[in-house]
């Protein structure tokens, strides 16, 4: 069983408490993308990122100084968005950290796909950003089926905890033999099911921590996810979607 999650826009240079254990599988390709980005003007970068002047200046300065081989920190501690805060990987025991290195993959616009302890540097590039590429229509086309192929080499079903933007990099390449299971966290609003992004991000992080803490190996075990906000709904769930409804 392997989980896929989205990265976070907000990144930090993590402390040295947890060392880098591996290098990104597609670091060479990430280097190509970084070089293209470093050639952008300030205005082009701002248009790419859709950021304010202040945030663009910070990100642009960081971009010009970026070197994928220096000052790396483990990916799982470098992303600091809500999902990662609620995952709280720094609170996992050693066995839990081994579990996420084996079972968790982070999809990335720059790096393609990452293991939790792959060494990364802060960057700003979402999969849906319209980076001008010489031989490809967009980043989805650039990455092609490589992210799927990396997952296909791992045994068991794919548990999708990623946003639609990132799951879109995997879905077109799924084969009939693949078991791809979406996880949905929803609220009932006026008789309809609605996803509340912030709460969903929290729950995704908590589910990864739950799986790692209990060393889960079967998708069915996720039904027992102990969430303070959501409860598994067997009536709405199917073989390809696990649905959790707000309590």
Swiss-Prot record:
Highest taxon, organism lineage: Bacteria
Regions crossing the membrane: none
Record-level GO BP terms: response to hydroperoxide
One GO CC annotation: cytosol
InterPro entries noted in UniProt: YaaA (IPR005583)
HAMAP family in the record: UPF0246
Family: Belongs to the UPF0246 family.
Name of the molecule in the record: UPF0246 protein LSEI_2080
